[in-house]
Amino acid sequence: MGKLIEYISILLIVVLVLSACGKSSNKDEGVKDATKTEASKHKGGTLNVALTAPPSGVYSSLLNSTHADAVVEGYFNESLLAIDKKIRPKAYIASWKDIEPAKKIEFKIKKGIKWHDGNELKIDDWIYSIEVLANKDYEGAYYPSVENIQGAKDYHEGKADHISGLKKIDDYTMQVTFDKKQENYLTGFITGPLLSKKYLSDVPIKDLAKSDKIRKYPIGIGPYKVKKIVPGEAVQLVKFDDYWQGKPALDKINLKVIDQAQIIKAMEKGDIDVANDATGAMAKDAKSSNAGLKVLSAPSLDYGLIGFVSHDYDKKANKTGKVRPKYEDKELRKAMLYAIDREKWIKAFFNGYASEINSFVPSMHWIAADPKELNDYKYDPEKAKKILDKLGYKDRDGDGFREDPKGNKFEINFKHYSGSNPTFEPRTAAIKDFWEKVGLKTNVKLVEFGKYNEDLANASKDMEVYFRSWAGGTDPDPSDLYHTDRPQNEMRTVLPKSDQYLDDALDFDKVGIDEKKRKDIYVKWQKYMIDELPGLPMFQGKSITIVNDKVRNLDIEIGTDQSLYNLTKEA
């Protein structure tokens, strides 16, 4: 389910490229903005869009791209399925029908859809994209997303030259057979954006992510095609006249990386028309501006947490190793959460665009438990102190900070990724202050985003406690982030009971097509996890997009039938 805001779901990437993936709580948070701009039939012109973070340059979501990369990709490529307002898949470029429920499915893609190099989208492109993920030379994190296809394991291990469960019927149709029945067979399947077989098949799979065809000259099937890329700074796109839904309204789109603290000023000067992935602070500034700026916000699937790297990890083998005992006691983790005034922290840094959460599932998803069923870790520093005292974390030398139960110095090493968001440093400092008020000495460090991701992916020894934000996909299953055997399980949690719940919720023999049975299991999982507390849930947010008064045909609400090709700007 959850996907890092910097790591976008490949299961069904409907990147609403002009909005962040985020989720508000079910209660009224006091912020009521529009979700869309006015309609217009205007044609022509250039739209200037601010990117709040520099792309890494891996412009394919199948190859471990960052969120910034995926935002760029969303302008020139498209997924094969869309989602409705209930976050369920619906036909778009592809349609499907069950041959054998949860075991065999047939997909059909529309005819006449062209890649930017002029070649037609074919079912071979879909099969190629799946084979890339299953190939033994693939170095990304998404093999688990295809390993349940019949024959994928043999292909991955080099025992077969094709995946037996992928059967091409014709140029536009294929049948997929899975090893076993699984409830999320559709939402958990790879539905794009795809890779072009004709364009990329001459590049060795191990070199795809660093190839010029991905980094400098990427192609897609979307309404705009890449004209020029200035690495880490800008992407220029021009309309693709052969786009399958018709000629796009705009002539050009320029994506520019701009420091978040300067975006509103750039919009006031007319240099920027749209700021996606905006923050609450930016929304506040936009509302106080006299430049005719408009704030759009909508519920989405974003939540943030503080994680603990609990075990050693061998990335190459995808094997979890020895436990790291420092934060092994869940009562210590509970004390750390009780010590944080999340309500005050959210109010200070999110300006009404977030709320507290006591779950590892965004409340917008249908599997979300009723908050009343979950432990509520309301701010209670005295309770935190009592827990720490009971555990034996006491100040033995009179310096104001607690030693561990064995009398050794105890310091929390807390990291946050760096970036242009001006709240990163103060919100990290605020967490330090909360913990130190209950006697837990804390060291904080902001780390360059690329290194931060690498350190987490490798479970580096100096990565102990860290901050993350995740953006959910259409599949609500949380296995990607919390199952022991998943590469994206950055906390390296080893909780057999959690794994069993997650496995059972996808076991067709146990739940069939009964969503209530599946939800009941996920609710039990949420109750278990909020008690085990492998991480500290902090907030769930809203998506925010800021536009000037000329932008038209933009709707950021999840499930809207809007394509970028309609997006326009009045002269």
Predicted features along the sequence, with ranges:
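Ligand-site clamp/hinge motif
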Residues: 209-215, 240-286, 441-443
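Aromatic- and charge-enriched surface segment that lines or borders ligand/interaction sites
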Residues: 95-142, 175, 266, 326-327
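Long beta-strand-rich cores associated with HINT superfamily self-processing modules
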Residues: 547-571
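N-terminal lobe/hinge region of extracytoplasmic solute-binding protein
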Residues: 50-100, 131, 219
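Surface-exposed binding/hinge segments that line
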Residues: 143-202
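Extracytoplasmic/peripheral linker and loop segments enriched in polar/acidic and small residues
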Residues: 38, 103, 334, 346, ...
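Append "and occasionally in soluble cytosolic enzymes with long acidic Gly/Pro-rich linkers
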Residues: 326-433, 524
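Gly/Pro-rich hinge or "lid" segments in bacterial periplasmic/extracellular proteins
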Residues: 184, 189-248, 252, 262, ...
